[in-house]
Amino acid sequence: VIIGSLTISTILVFFIVPLTIVFFIYLTNILLLIYQRNNELEADPLSDVWNRVRKTIATFWDIYARIWHGYELHGVENLPEGPGILVYYHGAIPIDYLYFLSRLFLWKKRLCLSVADHFVFRLPGLKLLLGVTGVIPGRREECLAALRRGYLVSISPGGVREALFSDQSYQLVWGKRKGFAQVALEAKVPIIPMYTQNVREGYRMFKERRFFRQLYESTRLPFTPPYGGLPVKFRTYIGKPIPYDPNITTEELVEKVKTIVTVLPRIKQVHKGKFLFSFQTKTAVQALISKHQTIPGNIWKALLERFDKRRK
């Protein structure tokens, strides 16, 4: 009886935190609706008139990030003043990305637009929240328009597929996606790589998921439930921008970004410099890999890093 109770309790704990995140997201949208009604706002969701409530939302999520994950953000200085495309690794639950958006707004008063999968826009009751926080579809025209208006635009080429079917090896699941590179070349903007340490240790997907893979490929809906929510250490690293180069092809740019995001968690020593010299990003890479991601990911190590005050 005791063992059974403990098992049930453990299962509940592993699902409570992800469900709590969903609850807070919907609560945030309700607060936005109240704010909109009280202030009789009908402005463009991307307008600065929403900055006051954006700051409130960002402050809440930043406090949550500090308490639950000891969240740190490094490399903000690598973000261009103007437009650019942020390319990042997609965790099982991209809560780390929400932390990044919140801290970026608090530190820089800057709104980064986020490309999301189509299913996100079908979620009930989140229209206002998605608009005010700058979540947009991944259509080429919308991305180009945002970049021409001077926004940072973020995208995870792996998207939902990477969230569901990558694992503790942190392998990228990009397939043949290269739209982000085409947009960057057309808009003549840099691409900035980004990843969060231990994101797969915080939230995971079940390993036996062949059925869910087939289900996703046929429906494009994420039926695989995430679990976890352990208070592991999260550190987001922003790498040095890959500048616009009119002589590079889309395929070469895709591979360049893919190599950076893949190799950053694996390089164990600064003197392994072929990667650094090849892509001329020595300073940024050294900052990112000063404390590398353990491959495969290790939950216990990620938890213990909460007590390690040295910068990773």
Where in the sequence are the language-model features?
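Non-catalytic C-terminal accessory region of glycerolipid acyltransferases
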Residues: 1-35, 49, 53, 145-312
